[in-house]
């Protein structure tokens, strides 16, 4: 059984979502159509935290009860999952590098504000943008992201996400993943593959 562990970026990230629909609700409807065709052959999982986050964007009454039927909500078993020590070492080192980078961003902003006192507000906005990028881009920056990784490890699932941090750490931990930008094509191919398989069985 193929098991996919889904991130919100499939339905919320505009660049990814447009393959499924214009809005998160339309994207979810399209996805659920694929899930229906793959029912019994492919399973789709979400940690409860990710699911709750997603439902802030999706009109629940328009996707129920299918969303309950085709998306399995499961928390990772945080007490029994073993994390390799090197992952903790890498995470600590990554955080240290990001703190140093954040300090350099702040120092640059201070120097700019001393030189150009008339544009302090713009400099602060730039500081916030660059500081956020330095500290958060490419890292697991929420409990929900970490739950996604842990659940995929626990069930030997395939993570589907457009989040660079999630995919980077999935790779570090030896977890299979699919870029969310290609997920619709993957689903279409799976539907066709199973249809061909059924046709061959009927001919026999």
Swiss-Prot record:
It catalyses: Endonucleolytic cleavage of RNA, removing 5'-extranucleotides from tRNA precursor. Coiled coil: none annotated. Its EC number is 3.1.26.5. GO terms for molecular function: ribonuclease P activity. Signal peptide: none annotated. Keywords: Endonuclease, Hydrolase, Nuclease, tRNA processing. InterPro entries: PIN-like_dom_sf, RNA_free_RNase_P. It comes from the Archaea. Transmembrane segments: none annotated. GO terms for biological process: tRNA 5'-leader removal. The keyword tRNA processing applies. NCBIfam families: PRK04358.1-3 (NF003342), RNA_lig_partner (TIGR03875). Belongs to the HARP family. PANTHER family: RNA-FREE RIBONUCLEASE P (PTHR41173:SF1), UPF0278 PROTEIN TK1425 (PTHR41173). RNA-free RNase P that catalyzes the removal of the 5'-leader sequence from pre-tRNA to produce the mature 5'-terminus. This is RNA-free ribonuclease P. It comes from Pyrococcus horikoshii (strain ATCC 700860 / DSM 12428 / JCM 9974 / NBRC 100139 / OT-3).
